[in-house]
């Protein structure tokens, strides 16, 4: 059966209709995007070029920074362009591509953050077996699982939307093509699809967050037997990771766990996990990490 598609493009309301505010947003988000790309790529180059940063934790951090660069690029350029121009339209094909790309990279990041928590658990709770457990082969395999999981998650999200008929209106109350705003303009009952979105996005975020929280409870419990210096170093590393986890997971859970509806605050939540968190990750991970900062100094003085 053919799916009626009278709409060839969508008009996105963005963050503001005020031209003065839009110009301010253009400057702000352009700066954020430049800082995001430069900061994350600096971490990737620093880790890949420094022999002292060859441990699993930095291997995963380099992959996270690589993902954040492209994850931010799935939303930020369009948001920046729409803040400058009045015609905030996006074709149906580009909308589907943006939806797939954002959920693909977001899914990879969710799984990778969980993998990084497992790496911290092994390093702190099983220090004598760390090198035998977290081998290069296992680390590469875990990253591969993250990419595969993100692809499957995004594929499901895309398939949920592709069969929907869009015959008008075509106004999306968002700055990016996302599931709930698209479901609102579909010309059919989308209640069941909304429940599937909650299952595929909301529950995945929630379950991964609960696993992360459980791993940190175990880590904190095991730190009682460590020395004061060991506790400080472990808490510094784990604290940075947990801040990143909270900044990414909490807005995602809020957006996708509630019953199908688009709330006004959803756009602000999307800004957190899609635009701001990729920028903050390099700062959070390197602010108190002397090894990374020393490697960066050597990189610039080489």
UniProtKB/Swiss-Prot annotation:
Gene3D superfamilies: Rhodopsin 7-helix transmembrane proteins
A Pfam family of this chain: 7tm_4
Alphabetical keyword list: Cell membrane, Disulfide bond, G-protein coupled receptor, Glycoprotein, Membrane, Olfaction, Receptor, Sensory transduction, Transducer, Transmembrane, Transmembrane helix
Membrane topology: Multi-pass membrane protein
Regions crossing the membrane: 24-47, 56-77, 99-118, 138-156, 194-217, 234-256, 268-287
Extracellular side, ranges: 1-23, 78-98, 157-193, 257-267
Subcellular location: Cell membrane
GO cellular component: plasma membrane
Disulfide bonds: 95-187
Annotated GO MF terms: G protein-coupled receptor activity; olfactory receptor activity
Glycan-bearing residues: 6
Sequence ranges on the Cytoplasmic membrane side: 48-55, 119-137, 218-233, 288-302
InterPro entries referenced in this protein's UniProt entry, alphabetically: GPCR_Rhodpsn, GPCR_Rhodpsn_7TM, Olfact_rcpt, Olfactory_Receptors
Key word rRNA-binding present: no
Alphabetical list of PANTHER family matching this protein: OLFACTORY RECEPTOR
Protein function: Odorant receptor.
Family the UniProt entry places it in: Belongs to the G-protein coupled receptor 1 family.
Listed name of the protein: Olfactory receptor 4C3
Native species: Homo sapiens (Human)
Source species taxonomy: Eukaryota, Metazoa, Chordata, Craniata, Vertebrata
